[in-house]
C-alpha cells in the first residue's frame, strides 16, 4: 500500500515538473539569440536571419494546438493549420509581447514593444 502511494506521488510530482518546463514566463533577446525562460529551465533559439514581420493573417487562421501549454495569456507549443498543413512552433509570452515562431524554415520574430 505504501509503495503504491509513493509511486502515485512520484508520478504526480514528475508530471507537475514536466508541465512547469513548458510554461514560458519571459522572453529576452540578446546577441541574435532569443531566450525563452520557462518556470523551470530555458531554451535558447538562434534568431540570426529571422524575418522581423508578422506572418500573414490567413496563416494564423484555423490553427489547432498539437502540443503545448496555455495558462492565461501565456502560450507555448506546436500549432498546425489544418487547411494549409503548415506547422508553427510558437513561443509566446503575453507578459513580454514577444512572439517567436517557425514556419517551415522561415523564422519569425515579432516584438510589439519595439516594432509598432
Set out the residue ranges of the language-model regions.
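Short, structured coil/loop segments at alpha-helix boundaries
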Residues: 1, 39-42, 114
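Alpha-helical transmembrane spans
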Residues: 1-26
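Generic low-polarity alpha-helical segments
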Residues: 5-12, 50, 86, 116
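Alpha-helical transmembrane signal-anchor/signal-peptide segments
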Residues: 24-35
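Well-ordered beta-strand positions in beta-sheet-rich domains
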Residues: 26, 44-46, 107-109
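Non-transmembrane, membrane-adjacent beta-strand/coil modules in membrane-associated proteins
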Residues: 37-104
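C-terminal/domain-terminus segments
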Residues: 102-116
Amino acid at each position: 500500500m505504501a509503495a503504491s502511494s509513493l509511486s502515485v506521488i512520484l508520478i504526480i510530482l514528475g508530471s507537475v515538473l514536466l508541465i512547469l518546463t513548458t510554461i514560458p514566463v519571459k522572453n529576452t533577446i540578446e546577441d541574435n539569440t532569443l531566450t525563452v525562460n520557462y518556470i523551470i529551465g530555458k531554451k535558447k533559439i538562434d534568431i540570426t536571419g529571422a524575418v522581423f514581420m508578422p506572418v500573414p493573417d490567413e496563416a494564423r487562421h484555423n490553427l489547432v494546438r498539437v502540443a503545448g501549454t496555455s495558462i492565461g495569456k501565456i502560450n507555448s507549443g506546436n500549432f498546425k493549420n489544418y487547411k494549409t498543413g503548415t506547422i508553427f512552433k510558437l513561443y509566446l509570452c503575453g507578459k513580454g509581447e514577444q512572439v517567436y515562431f517557425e514556419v517551415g524554415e522561415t523564422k519569425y520574430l515579432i516584438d510589439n514593444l519595439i516594432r509598432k
